[in-house]
């Protein structure tokens, strides 16, 4: 007998109070006794942690916390551990007598959550003498030990021979190992199973009736009938899959047109855009090249025109500058001419006035002389009149007074003597003896003049002397000024040098006055030289361009005639060139028409050619003409008919194989499927099911032995069978019934004898049956499976052949349809000449014509250039002709050099004035100081003395002459001397003198009046002459001032030169203005051309840049499009040559139409809808390809790859049509084979329920004698729910009413079950559960049962087991009983999963056992002993069980260290186990040896 596995010990390492403690586990009950806090619960926690190391489940609480969700944060484990590594180990010996140490390493994890790190491991094969602590703890010394880390434990185990260490990455693996070695009763596959096991342990630990377990007793007690449910699920899954596949096929059939529509429209949508982009890119590249060529040519033209414009601008600027200078010069020349004319007129006036003034001056001088003479006469007359009057008065007075007269005569005689003396004195002083009184007047005048000169000289000397004496400092200053200008100068030469410097400054000022004139002349000469240089440059340039030297005007005229003739010739050639270019244009237009015609017919030919190539590929024939196409089409039709016949034969063979396979696959391999139902009705089992496990070697024997009865029904009792048989409605023709024990059937009722290859069966005395061994035995599952395997292989071959035949047939049908379509649509044009080749030839000719046209255009451009050159040459000649005179002018340079010298003098004068002007101005003010050198004062003083003496002498002479002139009239008194001597005659003489004197006086008065009147006339005339002279003189001075202000030197040739210069400048200005107008016209026309060219070039450049940017950007996008298309093998479908001949609008219209259709087609597909929406972005053409790829991928995913032999959706759809009919037929047949009836489902569920009721009934027998307090028995009550009983009745008895559910393809079997449940139980609310979920629940038999726990308590009889109706001890006992029942149920359920030589350990817990009385504890002990179960309980100190092992736990505190003191003892009422015979024999032998 196999012994049950037992827990041997529990080892705790480094727990609170337990450093290294091992508790031996008793085979029955182990009691932990101790006071509060002694460590009982900690010990149980260590046991449970090693058993279930799942921290999400572990929650150790005291009984006051039972059921509380607000327990301590660490769930009671963290606080039970010490710091560092901790271990809990279970030492187990299983049924195979293997020692196993299942342990967990625990370590506190720092943090607020107070988590514990748990690592499970297993030590297997430890020798019996090695304790767990020897492995887990290292002894350091006699009194010290250290807890090993897990890797150290692994090393320590490795050193023990035969021991193995194994760690587990997960709790599932740990529990799987426990289950395999028989430590736990149930295989814990997942967290749900662990939770059930932990809840059971927890309920056992805390005692009482666990509501968590009683509420879900079905999950704990009733095993999941996985086989039944899986059978239903497999059948339902197969049916559902078949139906889904069939629906998918039907949907595919229904959506075939939609798929074709999707492919067609997506191809049109993407290919149209693809080809539009390709065409657009090709056109854009061509346009870009054209624009680039035009842009480059425009740039060259623009550069040429710009250079021309710059050259003309430069010439115009130079010309404008020259013209401005010319205008200034012309205006200056005109002004100068006007000035010269005015100056000449002024000069003429001045000359006329000068002549008048000279005449007036002459007359004035004459008149002055006349006036002076008249004055002299008047003075003399006045003097004579005065003398006469005085003489008369004197004579009268003399006559009146003789003495007075005598005195007067004496006075006169004295005056006469004095006059003679004065004359003598004058003669002596003057040293002129010839001097007379009459000549003294002239001499006196001469001497007075000399006196004035000498006086001036004397005054100058006096001034110099005064200056020399008073202004020595001024002399030094002036002398410094002279030296500043001239450097070192002798003092004696200072005045002279100063005068020379002043003259030089005045000459420089005079030179500066000619600056404007000389500069104007210089500008004139410069312009003439510039014109000369320009003319020479033009001539040189012309010579360079035309290789003709322009030496004279005749050569210019000859060149002009030559260029005129050349212009006429070039214009004629240009006209011929235009005519030839027009002819080529006409030919190009004709070729363009041909190209358009070829382009119009090319798409249809391309489609026809593609269809022809496709036909050639499909058929493998040449198909050279239309006759070969028709002939091959007839051959394809005949092949298709032959292939269809072969396919039908294979279909018949497949149907036969399917029926045989279906029969062998049925239970028992019966030919009649009704036998299973009859066996259930009669309460028996098919004989084939009893012998289902026989080997394949025994199958022929048993098949022959039972013969026709091999499909018999075995019943336990034949009595009453006949009545049941009579009631049968549907029954096979032959039905065999055998009486026997279903569970222990044997073949003893048959008298059989095995012969060679046969069996002879003696039925009775008069009947015997001989049956040979079948060649193919079908009795027993092994034989049937072998046959089924052969049949299925054959069927697979037949199916494959049929599929191949169907595919070939469909392929031939499609090929024939393709021939039909080709003949109908493309036969007329498929064999025409290739329009693309003709199109290429036409395009080549057109390109040649375009090149010729370009050559003519280039030639025409060259002619235009030559024309332009000739026109420019004529223009240059026109410029040169008026100025050819300057070409040979040689005097300009000399004149210019002469003027340069003058301007050099002018510059020197400017420099001299700039350097010394101010100094000379100061010097000019003080130059007179230099006349008298203070160092020459003595010489100057001597000179002054000499001049003064000479002047005094001259004055003495003049005084003598003046005295003589004053006494001149005294010479008339010569007679007075005589009168003094003749005094008697005095009176008479006085009278005579008086008469004479009176007459003289009268005459003198008359002369005086006449002289005065004449003097008055002369003075009047003199005054008028003086006024006229003064006016004329002032006018002349004004004219001279004006003439001086004119600043010109008017001479006879000045006006001629001015006129000549003005006319010359006027002619040059006219020429310059004509050239300026020509240049301006050239600039205007050039600017207009350049503006138009720039505008055109900007537009071309913008278009070029836009096109180039578009081409460059599109290139990357196009490369990505091509890469995508080639990588996904869709380029051949997108690159449709026929679309290349459509316009962009036509392609866009085609794409837009397909886009509208695609929006409707993909409206229900989110991925394709999003891809289509993204593909509408025209800036991202690759997205359309991605959409096309997505469509293909979608179609690839939609098409079943298991039945299609291609990845191309287009071909796959065609191939799928081949398989549709075959698959539809197969799936329909399979569904008929897999269909299950509702009656069989009810029968299976009822049988399973009955089996479980019997099992629970057996479990109740084990609990019938249990008693706790007033409880005398515990049992489980199981019953079928009323609503589910109604469902079973509906399934089995009312099939006809519910055919609409189970025979409908709309519902799966589960959904039909749910619908039926709702139909028969309309009062039950189904909630939110779907029919599928509810149907799956209804396929689980456990949902049909209700389980409850009842107790037989005192006089109340059997009552529902509830904690409130029982005492604490009764509840604990009842709960433990239920848990034992669950553990036993789990062992029964898991028996088939574990090895047959393993019986698992049984152990339960009970904390605080003080709530049980002694009788109850004894009952528990008895229960443990009867059910071979171990029990670990905790009890207070006052309880000491009589049996098992008891540990006394006392917690002691030594300083800051806690330690639990443990004392173990055996129960005093421990009964020894009965000794075996071997043990008794060994004891007897030992006794004999002792004696």
UniProtKB/Swiss-Prot annotation:
Q: What's this protein's function?
A: Plays a central role in chromosome condensation, segregation and cell cycle progression. Functions as a homodimer, which is essential for chromosome partition. Involved in negative DNA supercoiling in vivo, and by this means organize and compact chromosomes. May achieve or facilitate chromosome segregation by condensation DNA from both sides of a centrally located replisome during cell division.
Question: Which lineage is the organism of this entry classified under, starting from the top rank?
Answer: Bacteria, Pseudomonadati, Pseudomonadota, Gammaproteobacteria, Vibrionales
User: PANTHER family under this entry?
Assistant: CHROMOSOME PARTITION PROTEIN MUKB (PTHR42963), DUF4476 DOMAIN-CONTAINING PROTEIN (PTHR42963:SF1)
From the UniProt entry, list the residue stretches annotated as the region Disordered. 1059-1080
Tell me which stretches of the chain form a coiled coil.
Answer: 302-418, 488-600, 638-666, 781-806, 836-1109, 1210-1239
Primary location group: cytoplasm
Name the gene for this chain: mukB
Flexible hinge as annotated region, ranges:
667-784
Cite the NCBIfam families for this sequence. PRK04863.1 (NF003422)
Report the protein name in the record.
Chromosome partition protein MukB
Description of how the protein assembles with itself and partners = Homodimerization via its hinge domain. Binds to DNA via its C-terminal region. Interacts, and probably forms a ternary complex, with MukE and MukF via its C-terminal region. The complex formation is stimulated by calcium or magnesium. Interacts with tubulin-related protein FtsZ.
GO molecular-function term, one example from the UniProt record: DNA binding
Which family does the entry's similarity section mention?
Answer: Belongs to the SMC family. MukB subfamily.
Please, which domain of life does this record's source organism belong to?
Answer: Bacteria
Pfam families from the UniProt entry: MukB, MukB_hinge, SbcC_Walker_B
* Alphabetically ordered keywords of this record: ATP-binding, Cell cycle, Cell division, Chromosome partition, Coiled coil, Cytoplasm, DNA condensation, DNA-binding, Nucleotide-binding
Compartments (UniProt record)? Cytoplasm, Nucleoid
